[in-house]
Amino acid sequence: PLYDRTQRAGSPTLIKAILHRVDPPLYGHLQSLQLEWTPILLRWHRLLYMQEFTEATILELWDTLFAIDPTLQLVPYISAAILLSQRDKLVQSEYIDAMQFLMHLPDLNAPRQLVEHAMQLSQTPSASTGAFIARAYEQHPPPEPAESKMESAKHLLRELTAGILTQDGHGQSDWSPRR
């Protein structure tokens, strides 16, 4: 599991664990700033982002969240998605700027999309998911690790060879270099 189930769902430890897994460079930068996560997360989670966004945004966010997850297990993943949606600003920030920014976030354009991204993070907490979410908010994703590039190349090669080596009805390959 991504975190010890005994951890509180909104704890800084869980948010850091998610971020470490989905965007190690952003995680590293925020760690180097030694951010005070407790006041940020208290504000975000205790009031379910009510002080962060406009009333219309909150209503749409809550409607979507409660429809998908009435247990509120997605809340820490929503917070991680918020961080990814603001990645460019955060990686360029120093401590004071980052704290002020996180305490006064810009309004969301697509609250439903944020909840959907949080669900993706909870189901597949990986660097590729983090990069996908960052791109969805027009942020620059972190550089892809060399291993990941190799895995992408292997996957593409498997797809290409599967298309070439399709089987006919008798289990024989229908591919020939003479065709």
Language model: regions and residue ranges:
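Helix-rich, well-folded core regions that mediate interactions or catalysis
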Residues: P1-R179
